[in-house]
Amino acid sequence: MTEYTPMIKQYLEIKDKYQDAFLFFRLGDFYEMFFEDALNASQILEITLTGREGGTKEKIPMCGVPYHSASGYIDTLIEKGYKVAICEQVEDPKTTKGMVKREVVQLISPGTVMDERGLKAKENNYIASLYCYEGKEYGFAYSDLSTGELKSTVIEASEDRLINELTTLSTRELIVSESEKTVLSDVMKEQLGLTFSVHEEDTIPSENEKLVTRHMSLSEKRAIGKLLHYLKETQKRDLGHLQQAVHYETSNYMKMDYYSKRNLELAESIRGKGRQGTLLWLLDNTQTAMGGRMLKQWIDRPLIDRKKIIERQNDVSELMANFFERLELVENLKNVYDLERLAGRVAYGNVNARDLIQLRNSLYQIPRIRATLLSMNSKSLTELANQLDPCEQLTEKLEEAIMDSAPISIREGGIIKDGYNSQLDTYRDASRNGKTWIAELERKERELTGIKTMKVGFNRVFGYYIEVTRANTHLLPEGRYERKQTLTNAERYITPELKEKEKLILDAEEKSMELEYLLFTEVREMVKDYIERLQKLAKSVSEIDCLQSFADISEKNHFIRPTLSEDGSLHVKQGRHPVVEKVMGAQSYVANDCDLDENREILLITGPNMSGKSTYMRQVALTAICAQVGCFVPAEEATLPIFDQIFTRIGAADDLIAGQSTFMVEMLEARNAIVHATKDSLILFDEIGRGTATYDGMALAQAIIEYIHENVHAKTLFSTHYHELTDLEKELRGLQNIHVSAVEENGKVVFLHKIKEGPADKSYGIHVAELAELPKSLIERASRILEQLENENKKIIITNEKQPEEIHEEVQLSMFPVEPEKKTSSKETKLIKEIASMNIMQMTPMDAMNKLYELQSKIH
């Protein structure tokens, strides 16, 4: 590095400590980037790439952004998953000889964003950490730095379990050790799309020991320690707003894996990846940002505690019964700002006067919200009201100190009210009187000189001045006016009196601003003492906001309060898919019943494509989720069990990850459900077996149904195109056939979307193809093939359209000529028997791959 200039050497020394981040290196009014950072940033940020002399023969690549507008560029990099290290000058260049000292003052990463512009109001921004204990369990901790939330748990050392937690939280960043990162599969890293940060230290920092409770396990403490150490090293400031770590058990909530949540579109649409068209979109009428975040948490983790579900239902009932009070509550909530993130910014030291005005205005609403809740004479709502802490002394202090019109800048005055501090009032009087004197001076000088256009002005460079147009300078008396600045068409002067008054005014203004900043920081420090109380208040307000949202949505959409069954039975009368109904309109939607109990555990659903089988299945699951988050449900009547888990395999929107086929994904998801489901679970399987050959698929579908019926006993909705499976109703006591009805009118199919008992009598597949506007000749050809295949129930392989060859044995249908059947060798017979004896449903994916390799070697 000897050939580089001192400044470039300094840059490289700092960059060496932050290899995985873009280093924003402060040079004057710019943040500069060099070398590879410059090459990459210029492309990502679409800024000009230049070069700088640095002691080498060739110029060093360089690009930069103005420091006053750097936030937007930082946000862009963070949104794309990068990290940014902010390197500032920590010495005054005017008083420093030689190289100015520079240090990284903060590392900003996807999981540590604090700037409002980089955060979504109704979404948490989670950073998580992992500690693997002897390969048996994961200590798992996560935090939202912007709100101070900190939680932890212990989960099974399984990638599936880890993925479920990370996706439930929409985690932006995961902290792991180098060894842990190596263990995690590339497939997982690619699938999650989050930022991985390597950090080894995992002991609890001494100043944060109070955040951890004694009963936590070693792996949990290590995960928390790793997270806290990483935040301490990267943020380099007080993190006093971090709350005490709350231990949670995943078993206390309904479990749904990533694919089930995606298939049901709980918080993210499959199509647009946004909220539009999701259950969260429908249920969200929260008035506060923090209420919106809590609502998403509720939907991501439905309750399984009967008492807590009923408590929420009671609150929603009371709010629905008090319409006018609820309207008043909504108006009050609209004026409550994001108390959680305000508290975070206070702790971070980057809160401004307008933030404190928002805090004060929010606190004004708390007594009103409390009074409204108490007026409803509800025991449950009274308990919520009594949790509201109005922080009266803080409200009074903010009212007394901060101006309503305070600017964003905290160093230019205009923040503190008159009368708050006597010394500040003295400085202000001096400044105001001086300005009054100057205004009077302008009038007097005009009279004295007769120059009507003369004016007294001020700028930061030259201070106060008297400006006279060049045409009138001869009217000025000699010896009294001292020239200060020459302009194109005017001259600027100063007089001895103005010079004296300028010093008094500017001294007063400077002292006034210094004192105002000091007083503001004192108020800010006082607010810090209230952080914990504000965080508790924010939680209570958020809960009230979520409950009023449920009440509002339930009323507007004609939802009813469900009953929770004791015997595991499910009875829904005229149930609706809440989101589809909202999109289509209530008049267009066809409601349906659903009944499941110990004698009717499996519903086998048949019917044509596009008839509504998948929608019906989803609506049952969404009804259960609505009930277990404490909301009312879209039905005329509903009795529902408390499901411990929901498993879904719905639709064809498969992620073909890691080169897996649709069928492999299908089987993996089926295995996940069958292995983990209990009698208290809900399983939704849509067209299982469609991804493989006809008879393979049918055989697997039947075996899966039988296995669930005999071993799992979960409530199951199973849709299929294999009409042969409807005969299972005769063999399996707990299986019932239902179908989605359709009729033909004038040769066209009409979907009625109505669920009826019994199997479908026809598939209408060709009619659906016709609706899709396939070529007419193709439709006609398909109709002829269908007619031939249905003839006498014989399976036919078409070798020539005019001379069909009848085949009476069961074979897979083909549209092409087939080779004559060859005699099976003894070696092949052994392989077939070995394959037939394999227990596929009990195999892990790795076992299956090893077995496949073994069989392949026997063939060769």
From Swiss-Prot:
Protein name (database record): DNA mismatch repair protein MutS
The keyword DNA damage appears for this protein: yes
HAMAP family xref list: MutS
GO molecular function per UniProt: ATP binding; ATP-dependent DNA damage sensor activity; damaged DNA binding; mismatched DNA binding
SUPFAM superfamilies: DNA repair protein MutS, domain I, DNA repair protein MutS, domain II, DNA repair protein MutS, domain III, P-loop containing nucleoside triphosphate hydrolases
Pfam families tied to this protein: MutS_I, MutS_II, MutS_III, MutS_IV, MutS_V
Gene Ontology biological process: mismatch repair
GO cellular component, one term: cytosol
InterPro entries associated with the record: DNA_mismatch_repair_MutS (IPR005748), DNA_mismatch_repair_MutS-lik_N (IPR007695), DNA_mismatch_repair_MutS/MSH (IPR017261), DNA_mismatch_repair_MutS_C (IPR000432), DNA_mismatch_repair_MutS_clamp (IPR007861), DNA_mismatch_repair_MutS_core (IPR007696), DNA_mismatch_repair_MutS_N (IPR016151), DNA_mismatch_repair_MutS_sf (IPR036187)
Binding positions for ATP per the UniProt entry: 607-614
SMART domains assigned: MUTSac, MUTSd
Family statement: Belongs to the DNA mismatch repair MutS family.
The protein's role, per its UniProt record: This protein is involved in the repair of mismatches in DNA. It is possible that it carries out the mismatch recognition step. This protein has a weak ATPase activity.
Segments forming a coiled coil: none
PROSITE patterns: DNA_MISMATCH_REPAIR_2
Keyword entries, A-Z: ATP-binding, DNA damage, DNA repair, DNA-binding, Nucleotide-binding
